[in-house]
Amino acid sequence: MATGLLAKKLGMTQIFTAEGDCIPVTVLEAGPCTVVRRKTAEKDGYDAVVIGWGEVDEKHAHRLTKPEVGVFKKAGTPVFRHVKEIRVKDAKLLGELKAGDVLTVDKVFKQDQRIDVAGVTKGRGFTGVMKRWNMHGAARDSSTTHEHHRHVGAIGQRKTPGKVWKGKHLPGHYGVDNVTIQNLTIVGVEADKNLLLVKGAVPGHNDGLLFVNTAVKGQPRVKKVQEVRARAKPKV
């Protein structure tokens, strides 16, 4: 199967393990996604599949361009609101996929698997340097004017260089950035509800669009994990 799915963030909660440990988890509604197109190295220069998620009704289908609608019409699939292209390195896996195939969460992911989650962070509007860049701020004593406690301070010199360098940390818009959180662990898969329980937090607000993919940095070795857990158990 493909290595990733489009998902929606539902919110955060907590679960308890058999040992009684409390784990914070994020609940994701992942898929089911439909294969819209298959790309091959012979025709397109690389191997990939394009998946779609979130059907668009006839009322809103007119917002798409004719070329966009033509892609779905050629594949014989419904019109989707979100599409994502996934590179596929395994030629055998690519050969098994075809337009119209449905990818469900239990076919793509399993428990204890490592994943990468990409999304857009929450927008926080115009913020100062202390919130945006974690700057320390000026001294809180009588030598500093009250208005300058949270200011950026000096941003350059005099004639040399005679300018403010590009990339200087200044006040500005904070958030709405594309961020990928790597090596998160799946602690639960509920196939009947298309849900993924992911340990930790993921980018964005509730109902935000996410892309969940297999971790690029590899999966943990099962034997090694079992050895670490065995050593961590307290001796009675």
UniProtKB/Swiss-Prot annotation:
Parts of the chain that traverse the membrane: none
GO cellular component: cytosolic large ribosomal subunit
Subunit relationships: Part of the 50S ribosomal subunit. Forms a cluster with proteins L14 and L19.
SUPFAM superfamilies for this protein: Translation proteins
Any Pfam family: Ribosomal_L3
GO molecular function: rRNA binding; structural constituent of ribosome
Name of encoding gene: rplC
Chain's role: One of the primary rRNA binding proteins, it binds directly near the 3'-end of the 23S rRNA, where it nucleates assembly of the 50S subunit.
InterPro entries: Ribosomal_uL3, Ribosomal_uL3_bac/org-type, Ribosomal_uL3_CS, Transl_B-barrel_sf
Annotated GO biological process: translation
Keywords: Ribonucleoprotein, Ribosomal protein, RNA-binding, rRNA-binding
Gene3D superfamilies named in the record: 3.30.160.810, Translation factors
Signal peptide location: none
Keyword Transport: no
PANTHER family xrefs: 50S RIBOSOMAL PROTEIN L3, LARGE RIBOSOMAL SUBUNIT PROTEIN UL3C
Ranges where the record places region Disordered: 139-163
Family membership: Belongs to the universal ribosomal protein uL3 family.
Protein name from the UniProt record: Large ribosomal subunit protein uL3
